[in-house]
Amino acid sequence: MKEKILLGGYTKRVSKGVYSVLLDSKKAELSALTEVAAVQNPTYITLDQKGHLYTCAADGNGGGIAAFDFDGQNTTHLGNVTSTGAPLCYVAVDEARQLVYGANYHLGEVRVYKIQADGSLRLTDTVKHNGSGPRPEQASSHVHYSDLTPDGRLVTCDLGTDEVTVYDVIGEGKLNIVTIYRAEKGMGARHISFHPNGKIAYLVGELNSTIEVLSYNEEKGRFARLQTISTLPEDYHGANGVAAIRISSDGKFLYASNRGHDSLAIYKVSPLGTKLESIGWTKTEGHIPRDFNFNKTEDYIIVAHQESDNLTLFLRDKNTGSLTLEQKDFYAPEITCVLPL
């Protein structure tokens, strides 16, 4: 059986935009790198249920989001919604409200777009974050993530201010702040992933290489810290920046990618999700593992390396969480986002 996986990334060197690859799950093999959409710097991508592809996009001196029709093979460009400044770094679809959310790292903004009948987008709200953190990389707000909580609120992670903000989404796409969780100072809050029970979340810190385990109170939309754990071995003292974080759908294992140590940190998750136990690290066979993802059956993990331009394929043991190398050095340039179909 062959599965298709979409890839987004930078177009600074050789990449032309969004690509696809095929995963043969019987042979444990990636093949057929194919260009899907020509777009500048689609560093994060997402699909809605109707087959619309939304990507971060640069456009001349501006940045924003691009929309495409995608039939599984080819794309038709539906248009860009851009403004002055750098492009987004994260995009997510809200199917229930027919909205798309975007995070703008450089401008410190959260943006909301309404999906139109033809799949194109209309900007409905922009919220500017303010503040800073103690590290040089935190001179101002840097919103790095904007996606839904299990109960349908919007949650954002701000790498510049170490804050996780929960919003109610009102009407046709207006945001109203509910709560602000303040992570460890200098953490660099990047992404958050929720346990399948919806009551626990895992916040990854790019700048201090940690994961904070958080309880989530749905009634109040409030986070509280339960545990902090490192993503690195004790004997590693080199540079590192954590990137992606994913939890298996059964809630048993959590993974995070280390850029610098160039590894996936693997954790066993307690039955209620409230505690992580480190069970080791697997080297990713490339440089700067910016993103990774499960295939749709979660038998495999595909790791994308932004700097070494390769994908690595691991077989995943669902009972132990451990990873076995199946393929490395599959060429895919400047990839920063892995999206299984």
Swiss-Prot record:
InterPro entries listed in its UniProt record: Cycloisomerase_2, Haem_d1_sf, Lactonase_7-beta_prop, WD40/YVTN_repeat-like_dom_sf
Region described as Disordered: spans on this chain: 125-146
Residue ranges the record marks as coiled coil: none
GO CC list: cytosol
Stretches that traverse the bilayer: none
A molecular-function term among this protein's GO annotations: 6-phosphogluconolactonase activity
The organism's place on the tree of life at top rank: Bacteria
UniProt record similarity statement: Belongs to the cycloisomerase 2 family.
Protein name: Uncharacterized protein llmg_2431
Species whose genome carries this gene: Lactococcus lactis subsp. cremoris (strain MG1363)
